[in-house]
Each structure stands twice: as C-alpha cells, then as structure tokens.
C-alpha cells in the first residue's frame, strides 16, 4: 500500500475540449479563476507532487506547474495522458484527475492511497452511483497492458481497467465532488451555484 507521500498526481488537461467549443477546459474561467486553479487548490494541500498533462497551451499551463504532453498523437483521450505520465514520472504510484472537476474531495489522495494493497493495479473513485474513471491511482506496472491496449487501437479506459486488478474507492459521502464541466452551459450553471 502506498502512502499519500509516495504518490505523484497528474492533472489531465490534454483533451480537445470539443464540447467546450474547443476552449481549453483547464483554462476556462470559473468564478474568476482558471478551472485548473480550482483543481490545484484542492490537490496541493494533499500532495507535493502535481504535474500537468497538456497538449495545447503548454506555455500557459506552465505558470501552474511542470507540464508534459502526450507521447502518442491524435488525442487518444485520458489513456494518452496516463501513458505519457508513466513515461515522464519515476514514481511507482501515479494518480490522475481531470482538469474540469473543480470540487474534488479534500481527502482524495489519502483515501485513494489507503485503499490500495500490494496487488492493486488501479484504484478508481466511485461516487456511489458510477465509477469516475479519470479519478484514479495506478501502479506503473500496468504499462505493458496499457501499451498493448493502445497498440490495438483501443481507447475506452474502463476496458483497460478490466484487464487489471482494479478496485473502487467509495466516495458516496461526496457524490458532488466529481461534477465535470464539459460545456459552456454546465460551466455557467455550476458557477451560479457557488
């Protein structure tokens, strides 16, 4: 089982943001701050190791921390960022969160790390109704499975997880913590509730 201090965390901001009108979701403003600032604000008290995976606007993202892009072209989705992170970071355990999830749990890192055992490959957050496949903590030993999966042209993240020793981590006490803001309308509605 890793301790929270033995994990590195990556904010996934590498997508095309097609539902956000092509605007980079991590840089879209929510209550006067870039959305990624909300994510960093929640994660930074929990871990000292935060990096950003971005394929566009890397210079802008670099004002928030260390940035790296995908190794695979054509936007393979979150799996591209996961693949790049395993190559970019040396840590055994790497956690991932999306850049468009501004209310992450304040105990995310600790709960995810505590749920893992020696044989866990992937821990995935569960909000009580659904798994949150991009809120995950994984062991780097999944890399061969991930590379074979991507080489086959597969992109559906949950299908990869099913090939691994996956556990779910219960966050049913905080179901609203995983609200993703994918469209300008969702962003506006969410901003009005804060």
UniProtKB/Swiss-Prot annotation:
Domain of life: Bacteria
Gene Ontology molecular function: GTP binding; metal ion binding; molybdenum cofactor guanylyltransferase activity
Keyword Ion transport in annotation: no
GO annotation, biological process: bis(molybdopterin guanine dinucleotide)molybdenum biosynthetic process
Self-association and partners: Monomer.
Domain topic, free-text comment: The N-terminal domain determines nucleotide recognition and specific binding, while the C-terminal domain determines the specific binding to the target protein.
Name of this chain's protein: Molybdenum cofactor guanylyltransferase
Taxonomic lineage: Bacteria, Pseudomonadati, Pseudomonadota, Gammaproteobacteria, Vibrionales
């Amino acid at each position: 089982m890793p301790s929270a201090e033995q994990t590195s965390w990556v904010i996934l901001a590498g997508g095309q943001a097609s539902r956000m009108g092509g605007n980079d979701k991590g840089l879209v403003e929510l209550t006067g701050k870039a959305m990624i600032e909300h994510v960093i604000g929640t994660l930074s008290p929990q871990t000292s190791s935060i990096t950003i995976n971005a394929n566009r606007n890397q210079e802008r993202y670099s004002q928030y921390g260390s940035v790296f892009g995908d190794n695979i072209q054509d936007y393979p989705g979150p799996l591209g960022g996961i693949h790049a992170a395993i190559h970019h970071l040396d840590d055994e355990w790497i956690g991932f969160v999306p850049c468009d999830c501004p209310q992450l749990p304040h105990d995310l890192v600790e709960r995810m790390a505590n749920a893992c055992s020696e044989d866990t490959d992937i821990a995935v957050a569960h909000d009580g109704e659904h798994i949150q496949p991009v809120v995950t903590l994984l062991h780097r030993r999944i890399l061969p499975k991930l590379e074979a999966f991507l080489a086959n042209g597969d992109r559906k993240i949950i299908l990869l997880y099913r090939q691994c020793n996956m556990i779910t981590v219960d966050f049913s006490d905080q179901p609203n913590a995983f609200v993703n803001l994918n469209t300008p309308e969702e962003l506006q509605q969410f901003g009005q509730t804060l």
